[in-house]
């Protein structure tokens, strides 16, 4: 048996990680710690989703979300190939873990493929796609 795969040098960060970092969970300090060990990247759509959620729940903390831009790089939608996005939608639609057929995070999976980066998310949607994804707890144990 081979040893477990190491965490990739870059991580694609889901909106729920950004929201958790802003709204006071321990994810904030973890984001800072992990950014010192890995490149953190997200999509425009994920950052916009986080902005919308934080703006609705706690608009006074939007500046905290904006400060995360010092740690996380945003990649534009046009930097991901349309065929990768379509393939990611298909992979998520048939993934057994979530069984809900949701393709809303296909942009993150396609970005991860484009960059050959693992995913960091609290969602189970990526399980079953064949692409590495990490919860915060598992990621901290691995880096």
Residue ranges and their predicted role:
Residues 1-42:
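Short, well-structured N-terminal submotif of metal-dependent ribonuclease cores
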Residues 14, 105, 123:
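Acidic active-site catalytic centers that drive phospho-/nucleotidyl reactions
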Residues 28-31, 58-59, 131, 136-138:
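Glycine-rich, phosphate-binding/catalytic loops in enzymes
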Residues 34-40, 44-94:
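PIN-domain endoribonuclease scaffold, especially VapC-family toxins
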């Amino acid at each position: 048996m081979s040893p477990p795969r190491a965490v990739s040098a870059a991580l694609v960060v889901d909106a729920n990680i950004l929201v958790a970092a802003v709204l006071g969970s321990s994810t904030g300090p973890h984001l800072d710690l992990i950014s010192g060990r890995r490149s953190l990247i997200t999509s425009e759509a994920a950052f916009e989703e986080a902005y919308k959620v934080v703006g609705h729940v706690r608009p006074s903390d939007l500046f905290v979300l904006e400060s995360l831009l010092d740690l996380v790089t945003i990649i534009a939608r046009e930097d991901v190939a349309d065929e990768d996005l379509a393939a990611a939608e298909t992979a998520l639609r048939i993934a057994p873990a979530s069984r809900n057929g949701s393709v809303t995070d296909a942009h993150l999976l396609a970005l991860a493929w484009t960059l050959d980066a693992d995913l960091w998310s609290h969602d189970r949607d990526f399980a079953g796609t064949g692409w590495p994804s990490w919860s915060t707890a598992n990621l901290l144990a691995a880096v």
